Amino acid sequence: MVKALLSLTRPANLVTAIADVLAGIAIAGYFIPHNPAPAPVGWLALATVCLYGGGVVFNDVFDAELDAVERPERPIPSGMVSIRLATSLGAILLLIGIGASFMVNQTAGGLAISIAISSLVYDRFGKHHNWLGPVNMGLCRGLNLLLGVSILPDQVGSWAWIGIVPIVYIAAITMISRGEVHGGSVTTLRAAGLLYALVIGCVAALAQRQQQLGTAFPFLLLFGYFIFPPLWRAVKEPTGRNIGLAVRAGVLSLIVMNAAWVAAFAYFPLALLVFCLLPLSRLLAKVFAVT
C-alpha cells in the first residue's frame, strides 16, 4: 500500500521539482551573500514536493477510467489504491504545499495557489487539448521556478518573464509524451527538438548576460547530451517505448537545466550540488514510474 501511494506521487519527479525551486532561489540572488537563512529554503522545498505530488496524484484520479484500459497496472485501476484514498492524498498534499509556501511569505503562498489551480486544470481539462495541454503543463513548471524566486518577493516582478523558459521546455516534453502509448509523430518529435535547442540557447544567453557562461557551459553541454540522443532514437523509430524513454530523459534532465540556472546566477559548487540530485532521481526512476 505504501509503495502504491508513493508511486502515485512520482517520487523521481519530485526531486526535479526541488531542483526547480533551488534554481529560482538562485535567480532571485538569495544565495549570493553566502549566508542565507535555511528555513525559507526548506519550506519552499517542502511546498514544491507537496504541490507536485498532489498534482500528479489528481492526474491519476482523473485518468482512472482511461488507465484501466491503457495502464491497468497503475495503482488505482489495479485496485491497490481506491479513488477516494487517492483523492484525499492529493488534496492533503496540495494543502500542505500551499501552507508551507505561506510560511515563507504571501507572494509564495499566492504562487502556490496558482500552481495548484494550474495543475488541477491540466489534470481535468488541459491535457486533452493538443496545444493548450503542453502550455498548461509548462505553466505549472514556470510557476514552480517563480516559487523559488519568491523567496525574495521583490524579485518576482523582475524575473517573471523567465518562467517562459520552463514553459517552452515542458511543452516540448508534453508534446513528445502524446505518443507514449501508441507511438508518435516524427514531425512533433522534430518540433520538440527545436524547442529543446531554443531552451538551451535561452539559458546560455542569460548565463552570458550574467557573465557566467563559462560556469554554466558544462551543465548545458550535459543537458544536451542527456536529452537529444533519446529524442533522436525516437525520431528514427517513433515507438511507444522509445518515446517513453525520451520523455523520461527530458523530465529527469530538468535537474541538469536547473543546475545550469544555478551556475549562471550563483556559483559552481552550488550548481554541482543541484546536479547531484540527478543520481537520486534516476535511482528513484528505477523503482517508480516517471510518467
Regions found by a protein language model. Name each.
Residues 2-6, 14-15, 142-145, 150-291:
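C-terminal membrane-associated helical module and adjoining short loops/tails
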Residues 7-12, 60, 76-86, 103-108, ...:
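Short, amphipathic, aromatic/basic-enriched membrane-interface segments that mark the entry/exit
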Residues 17-62, 94-102, 106-122, 160-172, ...:
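Membrane-embedded alpha-helical segments that form the functional core of polytopic membrane enzymes
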Residues 28-32, 104-105, 126-127, 151-152, ...:
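Short helix-capping/hinge motifs at transmembrane helix termini and TM-loop junctions
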Residues 32-40, 104, 126-130, 154-158, ...:
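Membrane-helix interfacial "entry" motifs
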Residues 42-48, 64-119, 138-140, 144-148, ...:
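Multi-pass membrane catalytic core of lipid/isoprenoid biosynthesis enzymes
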Residues 47-85, 173-186, 284-289:
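Acidic (Asp/Glu-rich) catalytic motifs at the cytosolic membrane interface
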Residues 120-123, 131-134, 138, 142, ...:
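Catalytic beta-strand/loop module used to bind and position nucleotide/cofactor moieties
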